[in-house]
Amino acid sequence: MKNNWIDVLDESLVKDFYNNQTSEEQQEGLNTTLSFGTAGIRGKFGLGEGRLNKFTVSKVALGFAHYLTSSIAHPVVVIHYDTRHLSPEFAQIIANILASHDIKVYLADTYRTTPDLSFAVRYLQADAGVMITASHNPKDYNGIKVYGEDGAQLSTDASAQLSTYIDKLGHPLHINVPSLTTEQQSLIHSVPSEVREDYFKNVQDLVGTIPQSDLKVVFTSLHGTSVPIVPDILSSLNFNQFELVASQCEPDSDFSSVASANPEDHKAFDQSIELANLIDADLLIGTDPDADRLGIVERDAEGNIYYYNGNQIGALLLNYRIKQTEGLPNRIMFQSIVSGGLAKSLAQYHNVNFKEVLTGFKYIAAEIRHLSPEQNFIFGYEESYGFLARPFVRDKDAIQIVPLMIKYAAELKNEGRMLKDELEDITRNVGNFNDKLFSHTFEGTQGKAKIENIMTQFRSETPTEMCGLKVIAIEDFETGKKTDLQNDEVSDITLPKANVIKIYFNEGFIALRPSGTEPKIKLYVSLSCDHFDVIAQKINDAIFNS
């Protein structure tokens, strides 16, 4: 097939990316196949079935059209896209193919956030949504995420059904994409302005009034979609004591000012810190390119800088939501199985119901969907900096969290306190959990095999002791079994199966899982113990250097 792909290089939309790849990278694209998984599809630009290009995107769109029309008489779909290379082009391709199958499409007229998409699906009562994004991946990546009528990413079963429709189509170069009739072209509409207006109202209702204070905020969109929506929302809440990092708040598909447009990466805040030092700011906030995740940094009066990980931000936000919802009965919060122990302990301390779900915010969305009328959702989060305070969106939503965090910090500022002080109070009450994420990248087909080998070996050689910590239980989410080593009992795990292993100690847990969206395997360590950094590093070395 290689010659066929070379023949279409000029019309593939990815010529420059392909020409800049090594011969090994080019071959990988031609010899592999991108699959539509539980998190959609994500990959590098290039030629071949293993890359994103005009033809592979068209195949996904055509399979999606067949999937929708197989069960829905007159489907309606909302399509949004981020600031990445080819995001608008891919969105238009998908819109055209859906319209050619008589599917009504609402297509954003400019870049939009992922939470915007989730909200729009719900507001417009659409049957599905599509978000063109690769989150914080490098500049030569993009992706397609598909959402159901509830505004959440497709369930595992629905993703599998869609994947079947896509796979049935065969080779991307052999697919006939029909031209649009004039009538079909009229099926593509702009997203109405009232959608965003109603989203604003929901955020305003969540946040209420931000108190007058001396709080100064620095904000960066890391070249993504959260500007102008964040400044607009803050202004609508009468909060104007913020400065944008100008060099990072313009759309830039190359993410030129950062090595990684990821708010988990401390270096992503370097320019924010420079600006904060200039204007004597207190709170620094950054969102990832599609604005579903955010990170925060705090600066004290002496200019000292404090970074917060996802579990600490999650605990702070949960603490604030507990205060906000005081007196509300049957409160419940959700977090992923690899998120740390601090928020869980805080929920238990305040008698808030708590449940863990698989990694992936769609599992939190599914729990929200199935809540009884008597239950009151107050918070959901993943340690990877994804948070949700109120479920008018059914995915991670950095946009609703930004003003909420600012309000929290403003109230504390008026008390002469910082988020740092609040976190110290929380740990004093419920225990100090230290968290660390080790992320190992293994590219290509060899890397994929290495990740599989690491998981296989870890399963077959599960220890009874690690670095002086006694193993008390093991959960293997792939087999769906939990082994209690203290009582010598095996029980069923009630969550869906997933390629995750979690090992418990009296001091906390570790978890090992391959990423669903990147060529990485991740080790999560959450322990309440002395010499945490040393022990965490030893555990990492034992798994990856053995």
Swiss-Prot record:
What parts of the sequence cross the membrane? none
The record, for SUPFAM superfamilies, names:
Phosphoglucomutase, C-terminal domain, Phosphoglucomutase, first 3 domains
Q: Does the keyword Membrane apply?
A: no
Recite the UniProt cofactor note for this protein: Binds 1 Mg(2+) ion per subunit.
| Top EC class, one word | isomerase
Enumerate the active-site residues. Answer: S135 (phosphoserine intermediate)
| GO terms for biological process, alphabetical | enterobacterial common antigen biosynthetic process; glucose metabolic process; purine ribonucleoside salvage
Q: Which Pfam families match?
A: PGM_PMM_I, PGM_PMM_II, PGM_PMM_III, PGM_PMM_IV
Q: What GO molecular function annotation could you give as one example from this UniProt entry?
A: magnesium ion binding
Where does the source fall among the domains of life? Bacteria
Q: Name the InterPro entries for this protein.
A: A-D-PHexomutase_a/b/a-I, A-D-PHexomutase_a/b/a-I/II/III, A-D-PHexomutase_a/b/a-II, A-D-PHexomutase_a/b/a-III, A-D-PHexomutase_C, A-D-PHexomutase_C_sf, A-D-PHexomutase_CS, Alpha-D-phosphohexomutase_SF
Q: In which pathway does it act?
A: Glycolipid metabolism; diglucosyl-diacylglycerol biosynthesis
Its recorded reaction(s) are: alpha-D-glucose 1-phosphate = alpha-D-glucose 6-phosphate
Q: Which coenzymes or cofactors are required?
A: Mg(2+)
EC numbers for this chain? 5.4.2.2
Query: Which PROSITE patterns does UniProt cross-reference here?
Result: PGM_PMM (PS00710)
Q: What does this protein do?
A: Catalyzes the interconversion between glucose-6-phosphate and alpha-glucose-1-phosphate. This is the first step in the biosynthesis of diglucosyl-diacylglycerol (Glc2-DAG), i.e. a glycolipid found in the membrane, which is also used as a membrane anchor for lipoteichoic acid (LTA).
Give the similarity note: Belongs to the phosphohexose mutase family.
The name on file for this protein is: Phosphoglucomutase
